[in-house]
Amino acid sequence: MCSSDLQVIVVRQAGGTIVAMINSCPHRGNRVCHADFGHADSFVCSYHGWAFNRDGSLAGVHEEQAFRSDPNWRPESVGLARVAQVDTYKGLIFATFDADAPPLRDYLGDFCWYLDVMLDADEAGTEFLPGVLSSVLECNWKIAAENFVGDALHAGWTHDSGARAIFGGPVKELAGGESYHASVDGHSWEFNLDEIGNAATLADRRILDYLRSRREVVEARLGPLRARMVGAISSVGVFPNFSFLPGQQTFRTWAPLGPTRTRLTTWVLVNRSAPPEVKEAYRKGVMLTFSPAGIFEMDDGENWEQSTLVNRGWVTRHQRLHYGLGLDTRIDHDELPGIVHRGQVNEANQRLFYARWTELMRGPQP
C-alpha cells in the first residue's frame, strides 16, 4: 500500500489481528514486498536475502553465520518497522505513525453515525470489488479533498455536459429543499434526502431497483433519516484525505506527492450481500463516471489542476479566495450530530475542513 512516497505492508495475522509495517528492509532500505495485494507467508529482500515473517520479525539472513559471529548482532531488533497504531471500523483499516494520536473511535467521534450510512446499511457488511484504479493528478491534495467535503455547488456547472449525456438534461437544482452540511472535527458530509440522486448517475436501473427494494430493511437498521441518505446526492470526506460518494460507491484516497502532485487511488465499495449483477453494475458505473477516463472525473481533474497551476505564482498565492457562502446558515438539528448548516449549496464544510487543517498545522511542535 502506497501513501504518498511512503509504502507500508498491511498483513492479517493468523489470529485475525492486523499488522502494518514499513515496506523497507532495515538492512539497506530495499523494498521487500512488490505486490499491491495477495497472500504471503514471508517477505524476502532481493538485495542481501534478509527474510521476514508475516509479523515483520526477522526470519533469517543470507550468510547467517557471519552475523552470528558479530557480538553486537541482535536479530530481534532488526525486524520491519511497525506502524504505531492500527485499528478498524466496520471493515476499514486505519493506521497512524503517531503513537500519541487518539484512539480511532475517539478520532472519528460522532462522525461514526454518518459513516454507518455507507458501512453498516446491511447486516452482511461491505466489501471492495476486485481491482483498483490509480492515477496522478497535477494538483494539491487539499483542493481535491475539499471538493468532497462539501462542494455540491460545482456539480450543476462543471458536470453539465456529462449530465446531459447521461440524463438528456442538466443537473437538477440543488439549492433549497431538505439538505445539509454536517461536520465533526473536519470530517464532513454534505447531502440531501432525495434517496437515489447519486445512484442515478450510474445510469443503471438495476442499482435503483436494488436500493428501492431495500428501503424498509435499511430504515429498520438505521432509522428513516439515514435510510434516505444511502443513495442520495452527497459527498463525504474523512479528515484529512479519504473521500467517498454514497450511492455511487466510489471510495478514494488523496496521497500528496508534493505540493502540486496527488496520487488518487479509487475502489468500489458495495454491500457484501448484493446480487452479482448489482455489484457488476456498480463497477461499470464507477468506470463510467469516477475513473481516470470517467465522465465526471475528467471534469474535476481539469479544474483541480488548473486551480493549482495558476496559483503557483507569488502574487496569486497571496490573493484571498472567497469561502463565504452560507455564513449564516448554522442550525441545531435534533438528529444530526456535529456542526450542522442548512443547505447543500454551501461552503460551511470547506471552512471547517481548513479550520481543522490550520489547527493541526499550528499545533505544538514535537
Residue ranges, per PLM feature:
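Short Fe-S-cluster ligation motifs
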Residues: 53-93
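C-terminal catalytic domain of Rieske-type non-heme iron oxygenases
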Residues: 84-366
